[in-house]
C-alpha cells in the first residue's frame, strides 16, 4: 500500500511539474538554445525506427533509373524541396541552417536511407520538423519520381534541375516538352480542356501533389493564355487517326447502355467528350487509368464508372492501343 501511495505522489508531482511548464511558459522554445540534452537523440532515434517500421516493402519499389521519372522528380524538387535542402553541391542559406532541427543538405539527407524509407519520408513528412507531407493524399505513385531523383543524387548521376525562378510557361515546358513517360503530351489537347484541368489542380478536384505545386507558380488569371499556348493547334491538325486492329480495338469499342465505349468519348483528334487519347504517352495513360480504377480520381463520374472494373492487363492493353494508334 505504501508503494502505491508513493507512486501516486510521484505521478502527481510529475503532472504538476508538467502543468507548470506548460502554464507558465517555463520551457524555452527558442531555436537558439535547441533541445535539452538527450532530447535530440531520442527524437532522431524514434524517427529512424518509425520510418523503418512503416516504409513500403522492397518489392513495391518501381524502376527508379528511368530518366523521365528522375527528370520529373528533379522538376518538383526544384520548387518543392530545394528551398530547405538545397540543390546538390550548393550551400544552404543561413536562414535554413538556423532552423532547429536544421534540414540536412540533400546529399547528407539521403545518404543513409533506402528507396522505401525515402518514399515514406517524402510522402508523410515528419512531425516537429519543417518536413511537410506530400501536398495531396493517395498519390504515392507521384512520390516515386522524387525518390528516383534522390536515388540519382546518391549515385552521383542526378541531372540538373530546372531553375526555380523560371516563369510559369518555362516551368511547364521543363516537364511537358522535355519529359515523356508519365508526363502527358499537351500539344494534342484542347485549350478548354487544359484550362479546366489547371483549375481542377488548383482547387484539388483533381489530386496531384506535383501539379498542385506547379499551378502555384502560375497566376490564376493566366490559365487561359497558358492553355492556349500549349494546346493543339486549332487548324491543320491533319487526318483523323485510324484505330488499329489489334487486342485493344475490341476493348476500346466495348460499351454498355450506361457506360459508353472509350472511342465514343475519346476517339479521333477532336473527341466529342473528354481529352484526345490517340498519341498520348502510354505510361501516362496507364497511370491515369489505374488512378481512376482505384478510386483516387473521382472528378468525372462517367470515367470512374468506365474504369472501375478494368484489370491491370486491360489497362495496359488500352494504354498501348491509344498511344500507338495515334502515332
Predicted regions and their residues:
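Extended intrinsically disordered, low-complexity coil regions enriched in Ser, Thr, Gly, Ala
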Residues: 94, 100, 190-212, 241, ...
Amino acid at each position: 500500500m505504501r508503494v502505491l501511495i508513493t507512486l501516486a505522489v510521484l505521478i502527481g508531482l510529475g503532472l504538476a511539474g508538467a502543468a507548470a511548464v506548460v502554464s507558465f511558459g517555463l520551457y524555452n522554445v527558442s531555436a537558439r538554445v535547441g533541445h535539452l540534452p538527450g532530447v535530440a537523440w531520442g527524437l532522431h532515434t524514434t524517427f529512424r525506427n518509425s520510418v523503418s517500421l512503416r516504409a513500403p516493402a522492397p518489392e513495391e519499389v518501381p524502376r527508379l533509373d528511368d530518366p523521365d521519372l528522375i527528370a520529373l522528380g528533379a522538376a518538383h524538387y526544384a520548387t518543392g524541396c530545394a528551398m530547405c535542402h538545397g540543390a546538390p553541391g550548393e550551400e544552404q542559406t543561413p536562414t535554413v541552417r538556423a532552423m532547429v532541427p536544421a534540414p540536412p543538405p540533400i546529399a547528407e539527407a539521403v545518404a543513409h536511407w533506402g528507396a522505401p524509407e525515402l518514399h515514406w519520408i517524402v510522402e508523410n513528412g515528419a512531425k516537429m520538423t519543417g518536413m511537410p507531407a506530400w501536398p495531396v493524399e493517395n498519390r504515392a505513385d507521384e512520390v516515386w519520381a522524387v525518390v528516383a531523383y534522390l536515388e540519382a543524387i546518391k549515385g552521383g548521376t542526378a541531372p540538373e534541375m530546372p531553375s526555380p525562378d523560371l516563369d510559369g510557361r518555362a516551368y511547364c515546358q521543363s516537364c511537358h516538352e522535355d519529359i515523356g513517360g508519365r508526363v502527358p503530351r499537351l500539344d494534342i489537347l484542347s485549350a478548354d480542356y487544359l484550362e479546366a484541368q489547371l483549375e481542377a489542380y488548383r482547387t484539388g478536384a483533381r489530386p496531384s501533389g506535383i501539379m498542385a505545386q506547379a499551378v502555384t507558380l502560375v497566376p490564376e488569371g493566366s490559365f487561359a493564355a497558358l492553355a492556349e499556348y500549349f494546346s493543339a493547334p486549332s487548324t491543320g491538325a491533319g487526318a483523323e487517326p485510324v484505330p488499329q486492329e489489334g487486342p485493344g480495338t475490341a476493348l476500346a469499342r466495348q460499351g454498355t447502355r450506361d457506360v459508353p465505349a472509350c472511342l465514343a468519348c475519346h476517339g479521333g483528334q477532336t473527341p466529342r467528350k473528354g481529352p484526345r487519347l490517340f498519341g498520348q504517352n502510354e505510361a501516362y495513360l496507364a497511370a491515369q487509368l489505374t488512378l481512376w480504377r482505384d478510386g483516387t480520381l473521382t472528378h468525372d463520374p462517367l470515367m470512374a464508372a468506365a474504369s472501375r472494373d478494368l484489370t491491370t492487363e486491360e489497362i495496359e492493353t488500352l494504354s498501348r492501343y491509344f498511344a500507338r494508334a495515334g502515332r
